[in-house]
Amino acid sequence: KGNELSGIIDFYFAANDYFMYEIAICINALCFDKHKTKFRINKRKIMNLIKGYESVKKISEKEKSSLNILCRGAAMRYFLTRLYDFTNTPKTALIKIKDPKEYYQKLVIHNNLKTYKDYLK
């Protein structure tokens, strides 16, 4: 905020191939708001994320055209990982099992968006 650092995102473990996959993972993790049991996409957060990202690295038109499929892929990845853990982790395990339905909802939202501009407006 202002001239103060308010956060750092380490993209190293997100991916090392497609830079837009980094954005897709961040959108899924940071750009949804929860209202009771429902998730809603927050396009203002997406715009701010992209603005900050592009202050360092410009996003090409080709990359922009891949945003939707990468967001869906990232949501599917987390949904399936959580679903596996939900169904296969013993009740006695000392880890917190996360609800896979969160990422199912996000996947449905991504399926209703198609273009890069759909994420911003």
Regions found by a protein language model. Give the residues of each.
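Active-site acidic catalytic loop and adjacent metal/ATP-binding pocket
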Residues: 1-21
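Short amphipathic alpha-helical segments and their helix-coil junctions
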Residues: 4, 8, 50-61
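Short, conserved loop/turn and helix-capping segments at secondary-structure boundaries
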Residues: 13, 17, 43, 97-100
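Secondary-structure capping and boundary motifs in well-ordered enzyme cores
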Residues: 15, 71-72
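Active-site activation/catalytic loop segments of kinase-like enzymes and analogous catalytic loops
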Residues: 20-57, 74-90
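A general structural signal for well-ordered secondary-structure junctions
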Residues: 33, 59, 113-116
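All-alpha amphipathic helical-bundle segments outside canonical DNA-binding/catalytic cores
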Residues: 61-71
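ATP/Mg2+ or Mg2+-diphosphate-binding catalytic cores
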Residues: 78-121
